[in-house]
Amino acid sequence: MTIKLIVGLANPGAEYAATRHNAGAWYVDLLAERLRAPLREEPKFFGYTSRVTLEGEDVRLLVPTTFMNLSGKAVGAMASFYRIMPDEILVAHDELDLPPGVAKFKLGGGHGGHNGLKDIINKLGNNPNFHRLRVGIGHPGDKNKVVGFVLGKPPVSEQKLIDDAIDEAARCTEVWFKEGLTKATNRLHAFKAQ
């Protein structure tokens, strides 16, 4: 099994760029920068895309330009055009249930109330069996404060932790392609930014 599409979830526009909900896109932006593959807007895929080669594998990068709750439109369009199966997709998203400084790989599962994941599952024919990179952003402690929290900007100290976890996740993505998912997962899951 190889990953052929890596997606970073976000809301579009400058006003959302630095918000916690865009943590998935920060990861794809970093990968694109590391692999010297600048993202370009591609309207037919409703997002910014790029093509990279990782260990000889052809991989597409995607940051949807739809709002978060319509992310499946972009993922579905690209998956269908390139005939990419759900288990060949890695979706990076912000995760309330992990603290800043932690990121984890996961295959399948529910959407946990994340509207981006919910729409992707829906547009992939109700198939939740794609890989996820869960980027920890922490939780406000009260479910009524979640919307304001994910659409807020983290303080500098938290931003550094999130950035460090994303940096490690990008390194572990390369490990995944070189040495397999188990090795990449073990390394990433042992990491906690200080």
From Swiss-Prot:
EC supergroup of this enzyme: hydrolase
Subcellular location: Cytoplasm
InterPro entries per record: Pept_tRNA_hydro, Pept_tRNA_hydro_CS, Pept_tRNA_hydro_sf
SUPFAM superfamilies per UniProt: Peptidyl-tRNA hydrolase-like
GO terms assigned for molecular function: peptidyl-tRNA hydrolase activity; tRNA binding
EC numbers, comma separated: 3.1.1.29
Record's keyword terms, sorted: Cytoplasm, Hydrolase, RNA-binding, tRNA-binding
CDD domains: PTH (cd00462)
Site positions (Discriminates between blocked and unblocked aminoacyl-tRNA): N11
Annotated positions for site Stabilizes the basic form of H active site to accept a proton: D94
Residues that coordinate or bind tRNA: Y16, F67, N69, N115
Positions annotated as active site in the UniProt record: H21 (proton acceptor)
Disulfide linkage: none
Catalytic activity: an N-acyl-L-alpha-aminoacyl-tRNA + H2O = an N-acyl-L-amino acid + a tRNA + H(+)
One of the GO biological process terms: protein quality control for misfolded or incompletely synthesized proteins
Keyword Transcription included in the entry's annotation: no
GO cellular component terms, semicolon-separated: cytoplasm
HAMAP family in UniProt: Pept_tRNA_hydro_bact
NCBIfam families for the chain: pth (TIGR00447)
Function, in words: Hydrolyzes ribosome-free peptidyl-tRNAs (with 1 or more amino acids incorporated), which drop off the ribosome during protein synthesis, or as a result of ribosome stalling. Catalyzes the release of premature peptidyl moieties from peptidyl-tRNA molecules trapped in stalled 50S ribosomal subunits, and thus maintains levels of free tRNAs and 50S ribosomes.
Similarity section: Belongs to the PTH family.
Assembly and binders: Monomer.
Protein name in the entry: Peptidyl-tRNA hydrolase
Taxonomic source organism: Citrobacter koseri (strain ATCC BAA-895 / CDC 4225-83 / SGSC4696)
